[in-house]
């Protein structure tokens, strides 16, 4: 991902304030609610029968936190996203058979969640920089599919 120095600063500055547990659970939960076909990858998570069940599900929250912790690893290695996400790409491609489009969807949901959490602090330049990052992460995660 090519980010200017200013964009990197905007992304890392905001990311330092993100509550990964809260935002991660919300982002994954929203993905599962808005795109219900993604639930098939989470059969072991128990009750996903309604929006409130999904959003209150402790396994959704825990996995969402894990997802955002990985995102943090990516932000620390913006110049090597493919390397950073190589093992996760392999897992999601070879073992879990996740449609790579889901990575893009989750990235877009994450941008919405961050906008909701940060309000006016999530300025258009911050959003634009985050869109670049989540697109780069989605591409890195889809790398093994090519």
From Swiss-Prot:
Residues bearing PTM Phosphothreonine: 12
Modified residues (N6-acetyllysine): 59, 82, 144
One biological process term in Gene Ontology: hydrogen peroxide catabolic process
GO molecular function per UniProt: haptoglobin binding; heme binding; hemoglobin alpha binding; metal ion binding; organic acid binding; oxygen binding; oxygen carrier activity; peroxidase activity
Modified residues (Phosphoserine): 44
Origin: domain of life: Eukaryota
Matching InterPro entries: Globin, Globin-like_sf, Globin/Proto, Hemoglobin_b, Hemoglobin_oxygen_transport
Tissue-specific expression: Red blood cells.
Gene Ontology CC terms, in alphabetical order: blood microparticle; haptoglobin-hemoglobin complex; hemoglobin complex
Binding site for heme b: 63, 92
Annotated PROSITE patterns: GLOBIN
Sorted UniProt keywords: Acetylation, Heme, Iron, Metal-binding, Oxygen transport, Phosphoprotein, S-nitrosylation, Transport
Domain spans labelled Globin: 2-146
Modified residues (S-nitrosocysteine): 93
Sites bearing N-acetylvaline, chain numbering: 1
Family named by the database record: Belongs to the globin family.
Function: Involved in oxygen transport from the lung to the various peripheral tissues.
Record's subunit section: Heterotetramer of two alpha chains and two beta chains.
Protein name as catalogued: Hemoglobin subunit beta
Provenance organism: Blarina brevicauda
Lineage: Eukaryota, Metazoa, Chordata, Craniata, Vertebrata
């Amino acid at each position: 991902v090519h980010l200017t120095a200013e964009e990197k600063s905007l992304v890392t500055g905001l990311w330092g304030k993100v509550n990964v547990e809260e935002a991660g659970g919300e982002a994954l939960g929203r993905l599962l609610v808005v795109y219900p076909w993604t639930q098939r990858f989470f059969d072991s998570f128990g009750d996903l029968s309604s929006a409130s069940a999904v959003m209150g599900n402790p396994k959704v929250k825990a996995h969402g936190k894990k997802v955002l912790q990985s995102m943090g690893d990516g932000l620390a290695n913006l110049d090597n996203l493919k390397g950073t996400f190589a093992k996760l790409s392999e897992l999601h491609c070879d073992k879990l058979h996740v449609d790579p489009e889901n990575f893009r969807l989750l990235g877009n949901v994450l941008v919405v969640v961050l906008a909701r959490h940060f309000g006016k602090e999530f300025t258009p330049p911050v959003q634009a920089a985050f869109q670049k990052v989540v697109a780069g992460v989605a591409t890195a995660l889809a790398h093994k599919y090519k």
